Amino acid sequence: VTWPAIFNIFAYPVNIRLSRYISEYIVKKLAPRLFAILNCYRNFKFFGYDESKKALPEQFIIISNHQSLLDIPAYMNFFRDKELRFVAKDNLARHIPLVSEMLRAHEHCMIPRKGSPMIAMKVVEDFGKRVIEKQQIPVLFPEGTRTRDGNVGKFYSAGFRKLAETANLPVAACALDGGWQIRDMNNIMRRLKNGSYRIKVVKVFPAPKTKEEQVIILEESRTLIQKQLDEWRKLKSDIR
């Protein structure tokens, strides 16, 4: 897992094509392998509820709660047959092993932390056009930041509305749980022991046509995701 990430750090500045090749290897091979290693050495389980994906169309927008940096490889593992592209803050594109160079090489949507909202919306609009053209699956975390207590925070509408208007795709609301307990990188290996990560599609919405429909999707998705988290937390970490 470590060597491709290190190699990609040096490849990206000098050869974008090579970096994209390495990034593709990281996405398709290392994301599943990462969770297999964690399972083997730390008894850390990954539960992807594959039956929940049966109702998905060919292309769609994913909206999800957000808990840790492991959310990105977790989604890559769950949707390993799809080309995912994430909406993320631009600081993630620097100095994060395994993630940063991959985000840049694969042209994920990097939202500038500094600058006007107009610039940010233009970045999202261009991203929406790009994923449609390339048949990719955009992934958005409407909370805008990682949760501190594991509960679902407020879903902000601006980025989702612009992406929905530009891409005009159905929306898959996905629940994710397990990352909030390891969001702090201190003692991460200890925190991983006997833990679990879960991902499930909780509802697929038709493409919203109005602002009112966009708001309804966000509100209902947040409610359904929190409900799913509450149900999961009644289970032991090793029970599906």
Locate each region found by the language model.
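A short, well-structured juxtamembrane/interface segment
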Residues: 33-60
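Catalytic core of membrane glycerolipid acyltransferases/transacylases, capturing the structured
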Residues: 5-29, 56-115
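A cross-family acyltransferase "interaction/gating" segment
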Residues: 98-100, 133, 137, 148-212
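Residue-level preference for the first positions of well-ordered beta-strands
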Residues: 59-61, 135-141
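Short glycine-rich anion-binding loops that position phosphate/pyrophosphate groups of nucleotides
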Residues: 66-68, 143-146
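Membrane-interfacial terminal anchoring regions of lipid-handling membrane enzymes
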Residues: 1-29, 51-56, 130, 179, ...
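Anionic-ligand binding region
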Residues: 127
